[in-house]
């Protein structure tokens, strides 16, 4: 006997419009807030610059790895451990190299170029960072706090006589202990805070 399915109701564009709260979140409306270890003594202006010059980031992925348990030719999936992806940001380089220099100093405090010594205590080289998803009125829809991040890769910046009409950019890969989400304060803010 065939299973009967109820036909879904007709969906109209006006129904869709009523469900798209606030006109939808825009991927170009965001701001990144960085912190650097006190030990590296960077100018406080660098943190403010980063709010403008970090041109790309990501809201974090959420992963729980499955555990496969075999049973008589079948595989039972059991929830395993939570894992956290590397968080990558893209930075526009200005002529004073202040943000790149801050990340280079941070990495050097972890493992010095000259002699491979560096900070032993994670509290000395890990900091929290935030990415804020903004609404079109400038209010914060939702924020993500990345706990205990530290850089593990600063990308190279290619130089060439043939490159014109371009500003240098570089990426930074940051390791993340875990993250939490913070509900925004605007009229369209959604979701619940989770940590």
What are these regions (language model features)?
Residues 1-195:
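Glycine-rich, low-complexity intrinsically disordered segments
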């Amino acid at each position: 006997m065939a299973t009967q399915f109820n036909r879904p109701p007709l969906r109209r564009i006006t129904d869709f419009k009523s469900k798209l709260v606030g006109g939808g979140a825009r991927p170009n409306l965001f701001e990144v807030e960085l912190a650097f270890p006190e030990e590296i003594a960077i100018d406080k202006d660098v943190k403010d610059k980063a709010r403008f010059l970090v041109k790309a980031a990501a809201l974090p992925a959420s992963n729980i790895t499955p555990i496969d348990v075999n049973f008589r030719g079948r595989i039972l999936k059991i929830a395993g451990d939570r894992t956290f992806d590397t968080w990558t940001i893209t930075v526009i380089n200005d002529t004073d190299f202040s943000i790149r220099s801050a990340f280079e100093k941070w990495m050097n405090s972890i493992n010095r170029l000259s002699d491979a010594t560096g900070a032993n205590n994670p509290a000395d080289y890990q900091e929290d960072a935030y990415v804020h998803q903004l609404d079109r009125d400038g209010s914060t829809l939702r924020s993500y706090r990345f706990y205990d991040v530290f850089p593990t890769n600063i990308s190279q910046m290619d130089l060439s006589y043939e490159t014109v009409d371009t500003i240098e950019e570089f990426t930074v890969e940051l390791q993340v202990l875990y993250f939490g989400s913070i509900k925004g304060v605007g009229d369209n803010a959604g979701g619940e805070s989770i940590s």
